[in-house]
Amino acid sequence: MLGSQTKQVILGIDPGTATMGWGVVRQEGSRLRYVQHGAITTPSGWGMPRRLDRLFAGVTELIRGYRPSAVAVEELFFNTNVTTAITVGQARGVALLAAYRAGVEVFEYTPLQVKQAITSYGRADKRQVQEMVRALLGLRSIPRPDDAADGLAIAICHAFSHRMSAATGVGKPRAMQDN
């Protein structure tokens, strides 16, 4: 295990244009502490530019308020609905841009990696992941909305991945590079 010198605040983001879930955890050595969770929502009647602007402003505000040392974002997974994949990709882009502009390092995790880190089973269902998020953070109930629980799961995934790579020097989380 790591010593108590490892401290970081992690913002996890589950991208979406209607609802962007987020969760903040604090890692202190081998301990993980719940900070907050929520969702940035946009009205369905808004055009895409206005929705993306709201998401960008919301993520920027979260970064200013919580001052994370890392932002973990769920990678886009293959989706048979091309329109959904495109809009989720746009929301991801907004989150990545907000973190980049704030100078915060960004890490990406696939849904499989998140499930594996949280439940030790890459094919876990949504309810299993949510229940483990609740248990790992010592919460009385499963965080709502679902997107916010996913944001917390992504933040926890980063904390676990970061802790393991720091302890072993192997399998470092993939940070996005500024090339």
Curated annotation (Swiss-Prot):
Q: Which Gene3D superfamilies match?
A: Ribonuclease H-like superfamily/Ribonuclease H
Residues reported in the UniProt entry to bind Mg(2+) 2: 74
| The protein's Enzyme Commission number | 3.1.21.10
Coiled coil segments of this chain: none
UniProt cofactor note:
Binds 2 Mg(2+) ion per subunit.
Q: What GO CC terms are in its UniProt record?
A: cytoplasm; Holliday junction resolvase complex
Q: What class of enzyme is it?
A: hydrolase
What is the role of this chain?
The RuvA-RuvB-RuvC complex processes Holliday junction (HJ) DNA during genetic recombination and DNA repair. Endonuclease that resolves HJ intermediates. Cleaves cruciform DNA by making single-stranded nicks across the HJ at symmetrical positions within the homologous arms, yielding a 5'-phosphate and a 3'-hydroxyl group; requires a central core of homology in the junction. The consensus cleavage sequence is 5'-(A/T)TT(C/G)-3'. Cleavage occurs on the 3'-side of the TT dinucleotide at the point of strand exchange.
Quote the subunit structure annotation.
Homodimer which binds Holliday junction (HJ) DNA. The HJ becomes 2-fold symmetrical on binding to RuvC with unstacked arms; it has a different conformation from HJ DNA in complex with RuvA. In the full resolvosome a probable DNA-RuvA(4)-RuvB(12)-RuvC(2) complex forms which resolves the HJ.
Its name, as the record gives it, is Crossover junction endodeoxyribonuclease RuvC
Q: Per the UniProt entry, what species is this protein from, by scientific name?
A: Rubrobacter xylanophilus (strain DSM 9941 / JCM 11954 / NBRC 16129 / PRD-1)
